[in-house]
């Protein structure tokens, strides 16, 4: 037996404030405007599926890396294979484990073409946009499944200094420090540094020590210069080095359907050093915007 249940949907009016002149003032919710060299539009007018995170979202949910995004963004999956060198991303089930990635990553309009660079620690992130579905028409290679677009905070827009400390079990601790200052009204810089370590979450029965430890650290410099009302220049350079022990693998017994203990005496490690830089030049005209990015 099929039936229907009628329901009534009602809208809640927006409260108005009347000023001294009798004018009615309405306070509306903020509208997020997406702006990059590819397109400019209101977030809800973007012709596709997109997830947007701002600085407040990242701090509230303790998002500290690209892998952490997949815990809250629907249809995005970034498995943790143990090493930062292996960071495969999947959107709607489409991705690549071995070859060129099917999900693109851009940081300040600079493409990260190799997925071995995807896993890095966040600091001073302004926003993250996850575009789902093919983006090759605008972004070209490595975007068959979608795109992750990351923007960092501009020192021209926000100044100050802060230090962030984190602690946990298994000797997990980290520190991050950043400062953003204006030298003039039109020139500003930001400098940050970060370090994080842990001793691993598994024990090697052979050595009687923890296995899978991680040590990573790096820094970032950004210079923003508003030359005049038409021209704007932005330069950024970022370095991150990471040193990880070999991932703690163990044998699997098909008969007992049980994973064995971790026990080996072979020394193994992963070492990764990444340096990225980018220079963005922007010309603002009354009728158009010209942007050139070199990275």
Describe every region a protein language model picked out.
Residues 108-134:
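Short acidic/polar hinge/loop motifs at secondary-structure boundaries
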Residues 25-59, 87-88:
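N-terminal periplasmic "start-of-domain" segments of outer-membrane beta-barrel proteins
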Residues 130-131, 159-162, 202-207, 258-265:
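Extracytoplasmic loops and strand-loop junctions of Gram-negative outer membrane beta-barrel proteins
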Residues 67-110:
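Extracytoplasmic beta-strand/coil segments of soluble accessory domains associated
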Residues 66-69, 88-93, 106, 130, ...:
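N-terminal periplasmic accessory domains that precede
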Residues 232, 236-275:
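Flexible loop and strand-edge segments within Gram-negative outer membrane beta-barrel domains
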Residues 160, 167-198, 206-244, 275:
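Transmembrane beta-barrel wall of Gram-negative outer-membrane proteins
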Residues 118, 201-209, 246-253:
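Outer-membrane beta-barrel translocator domains and adjoining extracellular loop/strand segments
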């Amino acid at each position: 037996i099929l039936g229907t249940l009628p329901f009534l949907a009602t809208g809640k009016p927006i409260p108005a404030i009347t000023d001294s002149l009798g004018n009615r003032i309405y306070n509306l919710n903020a509208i997020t405007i997406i702006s990059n060299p590819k397109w400019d539009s209101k977030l809800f007018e973007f012709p596709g599926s997109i997830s947007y995170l701002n600085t407040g979202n990242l701090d509230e949910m303790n998002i500290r890396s690209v892998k952490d995004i997949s815990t809250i963004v629907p249809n995005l999956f970034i498995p943790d294979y143990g090493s930062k060198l292996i960071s495969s991303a999947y959107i709607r089930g489409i991705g690549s484990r071995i070859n060129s990635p099917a999900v693109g990553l851009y940081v300040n309009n600079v493409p990260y073409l190799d997925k071995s660079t995807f896993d890095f620690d966040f600091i001073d992130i302004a926003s993250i946009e996850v575009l789902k579905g093919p983006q090759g028409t605008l972004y070209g290679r490595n975007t068959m499944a979608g795109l992750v677009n990351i923007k960092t905070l501009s020192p021209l827009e926000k100044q100050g200094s802060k230090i962030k400390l984190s602690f946990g079990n298994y000797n997990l601790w980290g520190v991050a420090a950043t400062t953003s200052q204006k030298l003039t009204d039109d020139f500003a810089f930001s400098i940050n540094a970060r370090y994080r370590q842990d001793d691993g979450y598994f024990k090697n029965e052979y050595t009687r020590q923890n296995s899978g430890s991680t040590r990573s650290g790096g820094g970032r410099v950004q210079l923003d210069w508003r030359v005049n009302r038409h021209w704007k220049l932005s330069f950024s350079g970022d370095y991150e080095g990471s040193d990880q022990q070999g991932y703690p693998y163990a044998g699997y017994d098909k008969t007992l359907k049980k994973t064995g203990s971790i026990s080996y005496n072979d020394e193994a490690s992963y070492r990764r050093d990444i340096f990225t830089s980018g220079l963005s030049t922007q010309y603002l005209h009354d009728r158009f915007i010209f942007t050139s990015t070199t990275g």
